[in-house]
């Protein structure tokens, strides 16, 4: 007679069995392809309480359990001013998933609530600073965030449509303000739709953004559907009807940038123009190649 699995074990099995191809495989692909984890790393898995960061924490936990590469994990939750219900939901989900979280508090919601409309950028910047600081205090050399494939694609499109530049979201980067520390994105190759499917399969409920701004928006009927990211989500959804591979094409495009055809680009904070590079090469551009 087979032993009845605990809820957290059933959730783990769903990752490794039912959603192996859609979650575990792309997770491992990102870790290996972008060299995200090295022997001796001490990583702070940063958990906001949403579906993405909770899944990321579970994936890293499973990897640590089975990997030949030795590394340490800290499961870090920053409470930026959650209401009691959201704080409780995070703690309950962490217990359900058997994730031993370390929780610390900050006043981010208090500060950003006075900014005015859409304080999301400031909130994100402040969150990252607090997370880096606490992670370093706990002896970590890396923080892991739950950004996924869909975030990468949407950010790339948003940079062109609203930022007048071609800028992507890298799978890892070095911190400028916290020397010696890095940020990694282990879910870089995982699609959001697959995360949602896994969540529903297991009957899990996670918090959304949960900040005071979004709470007020929900109360007034403005649920954020006018946000630029939401606009891009809807656009990509529409494009998928005629081109199912559009998001994959955008994702692959940031891995295959042909600088010879770019009129201008920036690297290391230094701007380069097509004219400068053209003179340096000392050769004519062949029209039949473009």
List PLM regions with ranges:
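Long, contiguous hydrophobic alpha-helical segments, chiefly transmembrane helices and signal peptides
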Residues: 27, 31, 187, 232, ...
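Short, basic, helix/turn surface patches
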Residues: 126-138, 172-178, 233-253
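A structural signal for well-ordered alpha-helical scaffolds and beta->alpha junctions
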Residues: 20, 24, 87, 128, ...
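The feature marks non-catalytic terminal segments
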Residues: 204-290
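ATP-dependent adenylation/nucleotidyltransferase module used to activate substrates
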Residues: 2-158, 162-166, 170, 193-197, ...
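Short, solvent-exposed coil/turn elements at secondary-structure transition points
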Residues: 79-81, 107-109, 175, 189, ...
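Catalytic subdomain that performs nucleotidyl-dependent activation
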Residues: 150-236
